[in-house]
Amino acid sequence: MKVGIVLNPHAGGGFDDLKRRVVVRVLKKLDGEFVTADKVAELLGIEAERVKVKETNTRLDTVNLVKALDGNVDVIAVFGGDGTVSDAASAKPQTPLLCIGIGTTNVSPALCPPDFDRLEEVEMRGLVVKFGGEERVAFNDVVVGSTILSTVDGKRVQVDARRYMRGEKVIATPRKFRARVEVGERVVEGVFGNIFVAMTDRRFLGKGIAGGASLSAFLGFKGVVACVSEGIVVSTYTKEDLRRVEPIVTSTISFDDEVVKIDADEVVSCDGNPLGVGRAEVAIEDGVVRVLKPFKEEE
């Protein structure tokens, strides 16, 4: 079996010995012939067939390497965070992905735990985002807001999204912004702290505390938009900080096959990857990519 290897050494604050051990352990389980880029082979210290890709030190390193490996290997092993998984899927490969989390949050439903035994191929539903003439794939959510989560000095913190796009990691508190969201004839417009677009999840079922998202899941809607009065993409708040901004009010809109149109004067992010400020369109698409997940016996 030929195994393509994609590694984001910047995920989760950097590549260390602990992460290297995780990667090597997974590769030993796969027990195949490895194919990857020069830089990845050197970082891991492995024997591998090399493919030539232009190094940019940006997300394009992931996208371009996935494209170079697609169709030339049996599986593409992707090591990184949720944003790396999004970038790999955005290349729309035909070859299945095995995604292992070594990032900041590691909550993407496309991820596979590193201690897997048997694997099976699964088709993934995803959020397809159109922004600035580009198309991206997200599995967690599309978020509008002034902060994103990142790792600074080994700690998970919220950083300013605009400055992050300029290569700076600066801890910041959320700013409010004006935005308009359209789903068909339904419109929400105003000043918000965050806007989230996500696929519904069975975990919302029976959880009335989740508000409108609980009913969206119960009725079988594919997705839901949540416009939140305060910025909640934070990880450094104390109880007193939360008390200070409460009450927090959320307005939701459910959707199936409609296109969610967002016009905002704050940063749009795709699974933690900031895209820019402006207009975005989001839709849910089945079978955006195939991934390997732990095998489940039929009940």
Swiss-Prot record:
> What is the superkingdom listed in this entry's lineage?
Archaea
A single GO BP: NADP biosynthetic process
**Which GO molecular function entries does the Swiss-Prot or TrEMBL record give?**
NAD+ kinase activity
Q: Which Gene3D superfamilies does the entry link to?
A: Probable inorganic polyphosphate/atp-NAD kinase, domain 1
Q: Which Pfam families match?
A: NAD_kinase
The record's annotation in InterPro entries points to:
ATP-NAD_kinase_N, NAD/diacylglycerol_kinase_sf, NADK
Q: Name the chain's protein.
A: Uncharacterized protein AF_0748
